[in-house]
Amino acid sequence: MSGFTHLDAAGAARMVDVTEKEVTVRTATATGRVDLTAECIALLRGEGVPKGDALAAARLAGIMGAKRTPDLIPLCHPIALHGVTVELVVDDTGVAVTATARTADRTGVEMEALTAVSVACLTMVDMTKAVDPRGTIGGIRLETKTGGKSGPWQR
């Protein structure tokens, strides 16, 4: 089972021991989107959707999701998140979501950034489903990461 750090020699799952890794400043940015109908977009740009402030709810949910990443993703290390931002931009076809997570720790924050985007998108669908049950989540991906032994990476 070589090549998979989360599997031991017998193929059993394990949490990677990061004790000896150096603490470094690490960041990660992820993106995703929710495609919505023109009617729903007009409501988001205007009076809002019936359930409330969808953008604010999605932003907060994304931040909260990042903080809960190790509870959701098996074998993901709990790390001290030092900052999470979630930006939502309403465009002509839906809502673009960008999340950036930051820490100084022994392992990266890629999963936290991806979880923030995922939960923000899920919340946007929940907040808008009464107006647009066809809301579609897509394109969730890591865009950049910095820090750690492997150094910076950009899509």
Positions of predicted regions on the chain:
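C-terminal binding/interaction regions
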Residues: 1-55, 60-77, 81-155
